[in-house]
Design a protein with these regions (language model features):
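TPR-adjacent "capping" and linker segments in tetratricopeptide-repeat scaffold/adaptor proteins
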Residues: 26-42
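Canonical positions in the second alpha-helix
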Residues: 65-66, 99-100, 133-134
Length: 135
């Protein structure tokens, strides 16, 4: 085989390999752009501000507005859940945190709040699995 033949062979091999791995790229979720992003960011920051100031009803309203604008936000689910967990019913906070962890499984804070809620609901085995995953 000549040098040109070898170079052509290597080039084709690299091209095929690149194509093979290119097909396995993660699908990128659509994100917010333009006015929707501005509205979402404003509502989220106002929700955090209200939460810090102790105005939990307003915070919930702002975070609910965020969910209407973009319902794939794990951060909004976390913030809502961290407020709702202060009540007696843990059903909705548990659902929100399961969804948040599903959206971002490697986020430590989401997993910790999920495990905490599971403990409060006396779902100890499931909470242990979440803690074990964190270790």
């Amino acid at each position: 085989m000549t040098k040109l033949g070898r170079l052509l062979f290597v080039f084709l091999l690299l091209l095929c390999t690149t194509q093979l791995f290119a097909d396995k790229k993660k699908v990128v979720e659509p994100t917010l752009e333009g006015e929707a992003k501005v509205q979402f960011d404003y509502a989220f920051m106002e929700g955090v501000r209200c939460k810090v100031l102790g105005d939990l009803k307003s915070a919930i309203a702002y975070f609910d507005q965020c969910m209407k604008i973009y319902n794939k936000s794990a951060a909004v689910r976390y913030e809502l859940s961290s407020i709702l967990v202060l009540g007696e019913d843990y059903t909705l906070p548990l659902q929100l945190m399961r969804e948040a962890v599903e959206l971002e499984p490697t986020n430590i804070w989401y997993n910790l709040l999920l495990a905490n809620i599971l403990q409060r609901k006396s779902m100890i085995e499931e909470a242990c699995k979440v803690y074990d995953k964190l270790i």
